[in-house]
Amino acid sequence: MDPNTVSSFQVDCFLWHVRKRVADQELGDAPFLDRLRRDQKSLRGRGSTLGLDIETATRAGKQIVERILKEESDEALKMTMASVPASRYLTDMTLEEMSRDWSMLIPKQKVAGPLCIRMDQAIMDKNIILKANFSVIFDRLETLILLRAFTEEGAIVGEISPLPSLPGHTDEDVKNAVGVLIGGLEWNDNTVRVSETLQRFAWRSSNENGRPPLTPKQKREMAGTIRSEV
């Protein structure tokens, strides 16, 4: 196993522990707490994949961080912070919409690269909007936290989320997954639109009808899978 993979996991475990202590002292805002929950799932998946114990990794990560901090001067820290571009966290969904449990009458799940797509095939003839919470850097989507599909009545009928066992994805991964989800929902005669915020930062455009430019392959992929199972 690559030693850098191990040390990266160890440091991530310790930093998650520090953030959890911050949350326990009620010092974290809603985006902070949301990322904390998502990262916990990701760390569990990575630990299982790597065969590493999280508690042991956390202790090792603490030693790595302490060693670095001991060698780090305040001036070097200021220079490092100044050179790192800051990302922004954008929210289409409220914390309640993100954390709400939902169920599917006819479940359909598909993995597209590092993202998992879920939708309810029982939903038909509905107006649906896709909302997402994500981070942005250089005016471009950096990391998808969660995307959900809502009916006009507020019911959740679809979702795109990062796979805990496969951390890291690109804006192209997100756009491809959105295309697949739209194709699946439209197969059942639903009308789907994407939030203006997601259009702006994923596609760098905003269409009045809420439709980003999708390739025929994206729209066929989920629809073709659904057709074969009906």
Swiss-Prot record:
PTM per Swiss-Prot/TrEMBL: Upon interferon induction, ISGylated via host HERC5; this results in the impairment of NS1 interaction with RNA targets due to its inability to form homodimers and to interact with host EIF2AK2/PKR.
Region named CPSF4-binding: 180-215
Motif Nuclear export signal, residue numbers: 137-146
UniProt cross-references to Gene3D superfamilies, sorted A to Z: Influenza virus non-structural protein, effector domain (3.30.420.330), S15/NS1, RNA-binding (1.10.287.10)
One protein family per Pfam: Flu_NS1
Family annotation (InterPro entries): NS1, NS1A, NS1A_effect_dom-like_sf, uS15_NS1_RNA-bd_sf
A GO biological-process term: symbiont-mediated suppression of host cytoplasmic pattern recognition receptor signaling pathway via inhibition of RIG-I activity
UniProt key word Ribonucleoprotein: no
Subcellular localization: Host nucleus; Host cytoplasm
GO cellular component: host cell cytoplasm; host cell nucleus
Function: Inhibits post-transcriptional processing of cellular pre-mRNA, by binding and inhibiting two cellular proteins that are required for the 3'-end processing of cellular pre-mRNAs: the 30 kDa cleavage and polyadenylation specificity factor/CPSF4 and the poly(A)-binding protein 2/PABPN1. In turn, unprocessed 3' end pre-mRNAs accumulate in the host nucleus and are no longer exported to the cytoplasm. Cellular protein synthesis is thereby shut off very early after virus infection.
Protein name: Non-structural protein 1
Lineage: Viruses, Riboviria, Orthornavirae, Negarnaviricota, Polyploviricotina
